[in-house]
Every structure is written in structure tokens, then in C-alpha cells.
Amino acid sequence: MFTLFFRKTLTCWVFGFISFWSLTALAAEYSGPLFDAHLHYNTEAWNGQTGPHPVPDVLARMQRSGVKAIVSNSRPNDGTIALAQARAETAAASVTVVPFVRLYRNRSDYDTWFRDPTIYDMVLAELALGTPVGPYRGIGEFHLYDSANANGAVAKKLMALAEEKQLVVLAHVDDAAIDLLMAHTASKGQKLRLIWAHTGIGGAPVKRVEALMVKYPGLMGELSYRPGLTCDRGDLCPEWRELILKYPGRFLIGSDTWINQRWQTYEDIMRGYRIWLGGLPPAVAKKVAWDNGAALFGLN
């Protein structure tokens, strides 16, 4: 009788420990720094500091989320300048601003930038001016809703310019447009550094994503809004986990604060990343969360 009681007690203790360990493992989130590689500070968010999300508000959200650096690109570029000017505030929040020239002065530019010569002139003017934190480090985000527009005259000139000036490109495009854009550079995409916003928001298959990464060594995948990325409990789906483990130096995370609702849920967005990052080996998680972005822009 005592032996039976002892076995039952031991069994309960063992299963209890396993259950506790499992819950603890599930709850373990990545706790290190984050690099937000896709952030917008658009006019509706700040509106000359009278909008719902002035600089102190957005910096507080970044600080609460453990975000230590951002790629800032805004419509118009005044939003990025506002963040860059707030040097004391960003220093207090321990946030580094990496400024990009966005191609949009207003919403109508989304559909015409690739053929509008005034956009190219605007980019050149912004690059000449720079920002309070130094030169612009990249161009974008821009959108191509039809991949054929990657062959627009201005799109061609901007890709060549980006490679020539060693600027990083942030592009919201499909997989066909990646090939077209890369073809417009002198190196045919072998030297251009391009952040693929959403890593193909249209749902390019994982094998196609991998093929493009093999083809273009400077292609980085940013993972906001990526269809099929996460499965149960917010963990990575198996094929994406496998791809990230295979190419740990090629992925980035981002908030994509394109509307104010994304600012209102900023902490939740970043927590979602911490959940699935916690399921990766620690060194890989840190690469995706911070190291890759920091290395891309020389912040290490």
C-alpha cells in the first residue's frame, strides 16, 4: 500500500513538474532589445505636434516596448525630421533614429511616384539637406501595386541611385517586382541592400522567398503583416521557423505604423514579436530582433 501511494505521489510530482516546466517554456519571451525596421510617423499621427501621437507619446511607446532603434520613414518627410530633431528626447528614451527619405508628399504619390520626375528631384533635395541626426540612410518605403511599374522611369533611376549612394531601399512589392527592381542597379542586385517590406505581403511561397534570398545577398525580409508567419499561440509556423533558422542574418521586424491604430497597439505588436522570438534559439532571436538591423546601419 505504501509503495502504491509513493508511486502515485511521485507520478503526480513528476507530471506536475513537467506541466510547470512546459508552461514556463511557453511563457518565455525574448527580453532583449528590438530594432523596429519599418516605422512611419505620418502627418495624421503628429500633425505638427497637435495630432494624437506627438513625439513624447511615440517615444514612450517605444521605450515601454524595449525598442532601441527605428527606421523612420514618413508621409511627408517632416515626420521623420520631427523625430530626428528631438535629440534630447530620443536620447532619454535610448532610441536611435535611422532616417529614410520617403517618396510620398501626400497620398496621391502612392500611385504615381514611379513615373513622376518631381519625386526624383524631391529625393535628391532631401538627400542634400540631410537630417538633424545626419544623412539619410535609405529610400522608402514605397509601394508598387503592379509589379510592371518597377520599370517606370523614376523607379529605375532611384534604384540606380540607391546602389550608387549605398542607400538601403525599403520596398512594399511582390516577388516579381524584386527581380525587376534589382535589374535596374549596376550590379544587377548583387550589391543593393533592400529591405523587403512584409517579405511579400501577397503571400509569396517560402521557397520563392528563399530563392530570392539566395539570388540577392543584400535582400532582407521584414516580417510585419506577413501572411502565414505565425500559427498556434503566436508561435512561428514550421516552414517559417525553418527558413529563419537557415538564414538568421536576413530577417528584421517592424511595426508598420501606417495608421494611428497601429500606434495605439504598438506595445501589443512588439509583444507579438517577443512571443515567437522566444521560441527561437537565443542567438537567432537576438539576430532577428536587434543584431541584423544594427549591423545593417552600423549601430553595433
What are these regions (language model features)?
Residues 9-22:
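Bacterial N-terminal signal peptides
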Residues 39-54, 109-117, 231:
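Acidic/histidine-rich helix-loop elements
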Residues 2, 7, 28-37, 45-76, ...:
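Mid-to-C-terminal alpha-helical segments outside catalytic/metal-binding sites
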Residues 29, 81-170, 220, 227-228:
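Active-site gating/metal-coordination segments in enzymes
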Residues 35-39, 70-72, 97-102, 138-140, ...:
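Hydrophobic faces of well-ordered beta-strands that scaffold small-molecule active sites
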Residues 53-58, 77-88, 120-127, 177-184, ...:
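Alpha-helical scaffolding within the catalytic cores
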Residues 149-253:
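Catalytic pocket-lining loop regions of alpha/beta-barrel enzymes
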Residues 23-27:
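Sec/Tat signal peptide C-region and signal peptidase I cleavage site
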